[in-house]
Curated annotation (Swiss-Prot):
Record organism: Acaryochloris marina (strain MBIC 11017)
Transmembrane intervals: none
Pathway listed: Metabolic intermediate biosynthesis; chorismate biosynthesis; chorismate from D-erythrose 4-phosphate and phosphoenolpyruvate: step 3/7
Binding site for substrate: N76, H82, D89, L103, S104, R113
Active site: Y25, H102
Gene: aroQ
Marked site positions, Transition state stabilizer: R20
This protein's UniProt keywords: Amino-acid biosynthesis, Aromatic amino acid biosynthesis, Lyase
One of the record's GO molecular function terms: 3-dehydroquinate dehydratase activity
Lineage, top ranks: Bacteria, Bacillati, Cyanobacteriota, Cyanophyceae, Acaryochloridales
Name of the protein described by the UniProt record: 3-dehydroquinate dehydratase
Function of the molecule: Catalyzes a trans-dehydration via an enolate intermediate.
Domain of life from the UniProt record: Bacteria
Amino acid sequence: MSRPSILVLHGPNLNLLGQREPGIYGSVTLEKINQQLLSLAESLKCNIEFYQSNHEGNLVDSIQEALGCHNGILINAAAYTHTSVAIRDALAAVAIPAVEVHLSNIYRREDFRHHSFIAPIVIGQISGFGAQSYSLGLQALIHHLQTQT
């Protein structure tokens, strides 16, 4: 397989990481997470592109635009995980292998966070490992892509 390209999508309020509820989400900023992923992507020999939006439609547009450009999607839809049929449907429509990640363990939080519209259509879900959830998700996604060829 040639060098795979991965789209990393960050959902609403993730731009506030580092200052937003550090007891839940930790003190690592989104910029630091992206830097860590860039370093990991280099060692995994993949290309990576980042996009963050607080707007559902923009995330849907990014998913649709990934078709033909990216081999995989690493997504933290944040609060949209629990509410967005549109993001779920966009992921299903493009059928690009995807991994869902969350900083916190969504199943140890409020009841409304226990349901993910995204989980049934992605390869897998990683949650509860803080910023490392992203790294674990990227490793799993690349492994999946390499073993499917």
